[in-house]
Regions:
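C-terminal "cap" of GNAT-fold acetyltransferases
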Residues: 8, 109-123, 127-129, 135-153
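Extreme N-terminal starter segment of soluble prokaryotic enzymes
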Residues: 2-4
Length: 153
């Protein structure tokens, strides 16, 4: 395997949408308005400083993850998805790490994640990289029931 991590390229835009749509729908049954808005406004997100990373092997996308600025020096790590049809050991962790580094390199002092407590593999990645669970009064997504942050960047 000759996997490499690359920043957004137009030819992988649909993979970003498809991997995340597949993952969200297979786990929760439907996309939310916030998901659709993110997919429709990729260019606007990137103009605001966001970046989408891909793990790629021989021009095939394996996994993807987005890092986007929120308020002040807080950035969200989101839309971690993968290609179910291709074996990809470590691809999710690799794009997650690249997204964290992008945010840090662009002024993040705090990283933030909204997730769901049933997603054990994703929760493992967050904990592996030092994220700590936090309590929120409300969540941006109906499916969101757990949140994490990391401040020791």
């Amino acid at each position: 395997m000759s996997m490499k991590i690359i920043p957004f390229e137009e030819r992988y835009r649909q993979d970003f949408i498809d991997f995340n749509t597949d993952w969200i729908v297979s786990n929760f049954g439907f996309l939310e308005e916030n998901d659709l808005r993110t997919f429709e406004k990729i260019d606007e997100e990137m103009q605001r400083g966001a970046m989408i990373f891909f793990a790629v092997d021989h021009d095939t996308a394996l996994a993807t993850c987005m890092s986007r600025p929120m308020e002040g020096t807080t950035w969200e790590i989101c839309k971690l998805g993968s290609n179910r049809n291709v074996p990809h050991r470590g691809a999710g962790s690799a794009v997650f790490r690249a997204s964290m580094e992008w945010a840090k390199d662009h002024g993040a002092q705090k990283l933030f994640i909204i997730s769901n407590s049933s997603l054990k593999p994703a929760l493992h990645i967050y904990e592996k990289y030092g994220f700590k669970e936090i309590k929120l009064d409300s969540y941006e997504y109906v499916r969101g029931d757990i949140a994490f942050e990391k401040t020791d960047l």
